Amino acid sequence: MIERGKFRSLTLINWNGFFARTFDLDELVTTLSGGNGAGKSTTMAAFVTALIPDLTLLHFRNTTEAGATSGSRDKGLHGKLKAGVCYSMLDTINSHHQRVVVGVRLQQVAGRDRKVDIKPFAIQGLPMSVQPTQLVTETLNERQARVLPLNELKDKLEAMEGVQFKQFNSITDYHSLMFDLGIIARRLRSASDRSKFYRLIEASLYGGISSAITRSLRDYLLPENSGVRKAFQDMEAALRENRMTLEAIRVTQSDRDLFKHLISEATNYVAADYMRHANERRVHLDKALEFRRELHTSRKQLAAEQYKHVDMARELAEHNGAEGDLEADYQAASDHLNLVQTALRQQEKIERYEADLDELQIRLEEQNEVVAEAIERQEENEARAEAAELEVDELKSQLADYQQALDVQQTRAIQYNQAIAALNRAKELCHLPDLTADSAAEWLETFQAKELEATEKMLSLEQKMSMAQTAHSQFEQAYQLVVAINGPLARNEAWDVARELLREGVDQRHLAEQVQPLRMRLSELEQRLREQQEAERLLADFCKRQGKNFDIDELEALHQELEARIASLSDSVSNAREERMALRQEQEQLQSRIQSLMQRAPVWLAAQNSLNQLSEQCGEEFTSSQDVTEFLQQLLEREREAIVERDEVGARKNAVDEEIERLSQPGGSEDQRLNALAERFGGVLLSEIYDDVSLEDAPYFSALYGPSRHAIVVPDLSQVTEHLEGLTDCPEDLYLIEGDPQSFDDSVFSVDELEKAVVVKIADRQWRYSRFPEVPLFGRAARESRIESLHAEREVLSERFATLSFDVQKTQRLHQAFSRFIGSHLAVAFESDPEAEIRQLNSRRVELERALSNHENDNQQQRIQFEQAKEGVTALNRILPRLNLLADDSLADRVDEIRERLDEAQEAARFVQQFGNQLAKLEPIVSVLQSDPEQFEQLKEDYAYSQQMQRDARQQAFALTEVVQRRAHFSYSDSAEMLSGNSDLNEKLRERLEQAEAERTRAREALRGHAAQLNQYNQVLASLKSSYDTKKELLNDLQRELQDIGVRADSGAEERARIRRDELHAQLSNNRSRRNQLEKALTFCEAEMDNLTRKLRKLERDYFEMREQVVTAKAGWCAVMRMVKDNGVERRLHRRELAYLSADDLRSMSDKALGALRLAVADNEHLRDVLRMSEDPKRPERKIQFFVAVYQHLRERIRQDIIRTDDPVEAIEQMEIELSRLTEELTSREQKLAISSRSVANIIRKTIQREQNRIRMLNQGLQNVSFGQVNSVRLNVNVRETHAMLLDVLSEQHEQHQDLFNSNRLTFSEALAKLYQRLNPQIDMGQRTPQTIGEELLDYRNYLEMEVEVNRGSDGWLRAESGALSTGEAIGTGMSILVMVVQSWEDESRRLRGKDISPCRLLFLDEAARLDARSIATLFELCERLQMQLIIAAPENISPEKGTTYKLVRKVFQNTEHVHVVGLRGFAPQLPETLPGSDEAPSQAS
């Protein structure tokens, strides 16, 4: 017996309260005991998470955080985990004794949604000695361990030999491995399967009768019969396709005329547009070539005009440049004339101002002398007045002192003090600190001598100063003149510079006298130089136009050569005109012949098309009209023979059909009356009894019974006698055989078997010899073999009949085509090809056009050469008179030389004009510069110094005189002499004082008078100086302006400037006249160029548009041609006769066909859309697509193997024959495919019975289950009343509803849904379609109702409902149903998985305290009998007697929670045995 797989242990790593805990699972029941919050639900949650790691399903509702939002994805799992990496692992042993560890790595994801990240994995090949906790933890020390991340776990396992580690990216792959290894009972292919599995676990976990399970028990227990549904769907699809084909055939048959009309109009519509585009393409090509030729011609003309324009523009630019230069020269000459006139006026002003300045200079010098004399006299008067003042002051002082002395004569001390004061003042003034009264007299003489010396020196300096002032005035005048001419210089260099300036002045005056002769000479040479430059320009222009450089000596010979060329070209132009006329005449004749041939070509092409069609249809070549008439006679004879053979084949085909219909009768009866007689007599046809005879025995039994093989076997012949009376509706020979139809044998005859024959001894005197038939018909196998061979023969006959019919119709159509050809085209069909002649004439026309073009080019070149020769002669006529100037090479050098000399002379003239007066004034007084007189300023300073010295000496002498005079005061011995002496002195002093005051008054009067006169002199001098300075400044400004003007104003300058201006004005007028002529010619040339440019631009635009149109049309045309060739419709569309119609005619033809097509395809959406798209004139390929779509539309309705001609009408006629055969075949096929409603009912009933039996077998496993008052549990399966009525109607009363099942508009599913609605009108079907309802009715599961029943106490069998059962009874009932579901899954999965493996079987039960001891014991018995593992979570009051119990206690140690776990095995009377490894495990790790 196969051992069932088991779960060995559950391992929790880093869960809330469990750091590294492994729970060893009992083979039957594992109990988790503990109080509230001990960790029981957490342990079960870890198991469920490892079993179904789907976050969309997991929901531990009893521990979901309060207040969690609906958007939270926690579902109670996030709070059971601790931070970091967490694991939940299941250690299993399957039926093959393979250890498999499956589990998940969990980790909290930071965020408000409290998400959890889950990664499933599996480990295979792990040794039994390795514990799960050792894999995922790493011991750091005695009290600390670390949880390994998943990547480190992978690396650790890969390092272990023989161990396989698999990490899964999808839950489906994870469950697939668990199913293959026998860990779970069902393959969970989808989220729906996982949801069912989770709902089962959830129902087990929370106990009771789960409404989610009981409501969907059909989905859990009844397998889907997808094969039956697919068979029905395939049948319906085949019927639908068959009916659609039949409908299409009927539509095709009804649309035959429409197809003919569609083909005709589509051909006209597309072919007309196709040929119009072909014609337009040819026309566009011709136009593009014509535009290109005109474009090349216009470009050549434009190039010639541009060359001409460039030459004239160059000449005009030269004239414009020359005009600019001339205008500039003329303006410069005018400006020069104005400047000369201005300079002359300025020169006159300068001369007037210079005369005024000379006069003012003289007056200023005279006034300076007057002022100087007045200043000297003023100084003398000031000195006398000052001396008089001093003298008066001294006398007054002396007189005052003396009076004071007289007043204080008695006071000697005052006098003595005055004497001492005088002595001190004398010491100070005389700078004699050792002066005494005794030595004062001596020093007085000394200082008086010094005063006399100072006075003499002052007088001497005054005389020198008067003499030096005159010399200084002449030197300064000469020095200022030199400075004015030469610029600043040292005074000692004035003499040398003045002599050099005088010599230079002589030379400059000599050069200035040569200005006028040089100017006249230069004007003459410049005129010749301009003429020479003009001749050189003309020669260069001539050489440029000729494209060759010529020497001066060659010009006369070239002139004669050009005149000869002009005469020759004139003759050539006249001859070319006659040749051009002849070519144009021939061209017009060719064009007329081509037009006549183009009118005849369409008729010939139509005849040729008809003739080619006839040749293709009959496979003959016709060279004359006689061949056509002879072949028509042969065609009539062939038509008669084909009609006779077709009628014979048709008769044989009808005979075969009748025989097939006869042999196809049920029971092998060839006569329907025999079936009715057999039913009437209560017998059975002999053929029905032997219906199962093999094909090998069929000849024997056919010969054995002979004519009686159609007999009726009846139980008693005597009972048939009464029915034979008056029997008329029967075969001529009716055989009746008595016997039991259930045990009939062939012992009624005496038979001798021969070679391929039998001898039947009917009676002693009657034998029958029957040979074995070659084609036996006795028995179903023989009939089917014969029918098969008849069908094969019928196929051959049908094909032959179709072929003959097609040949007859083809021959008839061919006869009609020949008749139409003879009547319409025979007269012109065998004439010569006009298109070939048109091609030859077009080739000749192209040659003529090319000859004309070449002739025009040659003629144009000759005209150009003629014009060039004329221009060359004109240019030479202007150059030849100036050859002598061209030969003068030194003219420019002479001009430059004279211009340099003139510049020097003009510079000298400007120098003389500017400094001539200064030089004239300098020349008489230049000698005073030889020696520089004493410095006048120094002399003035010395004079002033001597005056000061004389004044100081006078004061010193006066001071000493006073001391000497007061010397008596130093002695008091002789007072009487002093008084008498003082009286005389007083008188003298008074006299002197009066004289001094009188002198002072006179000096003051003289000083005031002379000061007034000096003031007048100074005012006059200031006025003269101001006038002089003003005129000098104006003169300097005029001279600067004259220098700025830059011209030398002499007597002939104005005349020369005026002559130069007039010459330039004449040249400018001539240049403007030529420029105007060139501008007019250039304007005309530009107008011609503009016209040519516009024409060229228009030609370019037309050409490029046409070229682009040609290129675009070429691309589109290539696509059209490719599409035409790929689809093989070129022959139909390329109708050459349409090429000679105009575009309007073709467009009209296409538009008329388009209107007809719109009506023809109005009901066909595809063709209507394609036709609408084809109306785009820019997309001609879409018309081809429409034509191809029309053909494709026909091909979809005509079998490809019967389209034997390109003529659509012939194909449709042939299709008529084939469609009739197809209709018959499809009708018979539909009858074979159609399944009867009785068969459907039987299939569904058989399926329901099979599943009821399976549920009954499952119920047997629950018969012994009892708990509480529940004696037994079962699952009741019943057929719904409405569906049972449907099955009855389908099997018994289906004939009443054949309107539904025989309708071609309804599928079988829809008919079934309509029948269901007809039988149950009270049921609301909602928004579901009949097809959906019908598909549901084809699923047998919808016919069944399932409910759980319990046998409870005295109530008997009741429906299991939570309200009618106690809590424990409900849990037990639910557990029983879950076990049934698991059992059903295992049975179903044995077909998918090997039968040598038995999966693990484990359920949960939380809060088991609701069960009593008997119920718990019942669960233990159930687990033991079903080999099922059970995990129970219960409070501490549960003490099972069997299994393994874990006691969980949650403790808090140092703010850290951990669960204390103690495991016990069983509860025997002896002391409980502590399980190994059940000590408290540390729950914290660093």
From Swiss-Prot:
Residues 666-783 are annotated as: Flexible hinge. The hinge domain, which separates the large intramolecular coiled coil regions, allows the homodimerization, forming a V-shaped homodimer. Keywords: ATP-binding, Cell cycle, Cell division, Chromosome partition, Coiled coil, Cytoplasm, DNA condensation, DNA-binding, Nucleotide-binding. GO terms for molecular function: ATP binding; DNA binding. It comes from Escherichia coli O1:K1 / APEC. PANTHER family: CHROMOSOME PARTITION PROTEIN MUKB, DUF4476 DOMAIN-CONTAINING PROTEIN. The keyword RNA-binding does not apply. GO terms for cellular component: cytoplasm; nucleoid. Belongs to the SMC family. MukB subfamily. This is Chromosome partition protein MukB. Pfam families: MukB, MukB_hinge, SbcC_Walker_B. One of its GO terms (biological process) is chromosome segregation. The gene is mukB. InterPro entries: MukB, MukB/SMC, MukB_hinge, MukB_hinge_sf, MukB_N_dom, P-loop_NTPase. Homodimerization via its hinge domain. Binds to DNA via its C-terminal region. Interacts, and probably forms a ternary complex, with MukE and MukF via its C-terminal region. The complex formation is stimulated by calcium or magnesium. Interacts with tubulin-related protein FtsZ. Plays a central role in chromosome condensation, segregation and cell cycle progression. Functions as a homodimer, which is essential for chromosome partition. Involved in negative DNA supercoiling in vivo, and by this means organize and compact chromosomes. May achieve or facilitate chromosome segregation by condensation DNA from both sides of a centrally located replisome during cell division. Residues 326-418, 444-480, 509-603, 835-923, 977-1115, 1209-1266 form a coiled coil. Gene3D superfamilies: 1.10.287.1490, 1.20.58.850, 3.40.1140.10, Immunoglobulin FC, subunit C, MukB, hinge domain.
